[in-house]
Amino acid sequence: MKVHMKSLNYLLVFVFALLLSTAAFSVDKGYVGEEGTEIEVIRVSAPPPEYPRRAVRLGVEGTVRLEFDVDTDGSVLDPYVVESNPQGVFDRAAIKAVRKFLYEPPTYNGTSVKVNNVQIDLTFKLT
């Protein structure tokens, strides 16, 4: 019974943390063309990342900076971690979440374009 209650307590803490966790996002900008013109990309869908269970259990918070491209259809291409703090704790959850992001199909001078080197910060915070 004691082991069952301990498991239940962990589950309740995890669920509570998921409900109260927030993911803060930075302004999304990237570059187009050979001249590297900076443009903004508009995010229309951004499901929140899953808070890793171990981080919830240990009460860990952190930030992950990701970089990726936005394709002409608004989908995210090739996301990778630029830096994270604490290192490695939230990387997998951040990449998994950003792969589900959707942007308005980007245009530049009336033409559909792929936007390169978009960087965002995902902040994992227990509240």
Regions inferred by a protein language model and the residue ranges of each:
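Charge-biased low-complexity segments
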Residues: 2, 6-10, 22-127
